[in-house]
Amino acid sequence: MILIDTASLIVGYLLGSIPFGLILTRLAGTQDLRSIGSGNIGATNVLRTGRKGLAAATLLGDALKGTAAVLIAASLGGPEAAMLAALGAFLGHLFPVWLKFKGGKGVAVYIGVLLGLFWPGAIVFCVLWLATALTARYSSLSALVAAFITPIFLWWFGHLALASLFAILTLLLVWMHSENIKRLMAGTEGKIGEKK
């Protein structure tokens, strides 16, 4: 089991490291995504290129790589391996080996691993994100609100191990959004649909 757990963590990391935003924008012939807007490789920054289809594809790719990592590990090693794969995929997205450990902020892959581990939690996350986005128009704030509530939701329904895992992922997600939080507090954070 130790071998399977270790392999799940590593494979999860490698899958999580795939930079779909960068790959798709390069294939589409746009400029280097890291030189646009926030410089992030995630779907929100892809949206700033004006390519909504590419942004949606990036969101889907980043989410599904997390889901795939979880489902593969679960089939081979059970729940513990699946959670390790989820952690690996999340860390891989944040710190991809292919991009000198400078990756995305983790929102899509957070949704993806949650979908693989407990799909009702992913639905709750998306509903909370959408509700906040429609009212506040800030992608970062929407993600933070949904991520804060997710571990509480998991704990409430008795999934203590998952609640602990997602509490850790939420702390990492908050850390990755530290600059966004500063801009939110200063009133300078860009709203959804705005180009920087």
Curated annotation (Swiss-Prot):
It comes from the Bacteria. The keyword Transmembrane helix applies. Pathway: Lipid metabolism; phospholipid metabolism. It is a multi-pass membrane protein. One of its GO terms (biological process) is phospholipid biosynthetic process. Its main location: membrane. It catalyses: an acyl phosphate + sn-glycerol 3-phosphate = a 1-acyl-sn-glycero-3-phosphate + phosphate. GO terms for cellular component: plasma membrane. One of its GO terms (molecular function) is acyl-phosphate glycerol-3-phosphate acyltransferase activity. It is found in: Cell inner membrane. Keywords: Cell inner membrane, Cell membrane, Lipid biosynthesis, Lipid metabolism, Membrane, Phospholipid biosynthesis, Phospholipid metabolism, Transferase, Transmembrane, Transmembrane helix. The chain crosses the membrane at residues 2-22, 54-74, 81-101, 111-131, 152-172. Catalyzes the transfer of an acyl group from acyl-phosphate (acyl-PO(4)) to glycerol-3-phosphate (G3P) to form lysophosphatidic acid (LPA). This enzyme utilizes acyl-phosphate as fatty acyl donor, but not acyl-CoA or acyl-ACP. Belongs to the PlsY family. Probably interacts with PlsX. This is Glycerol-3-phosphate acyltransferase. It comes from Rhodopseudomonas palustris (strain BisB18).
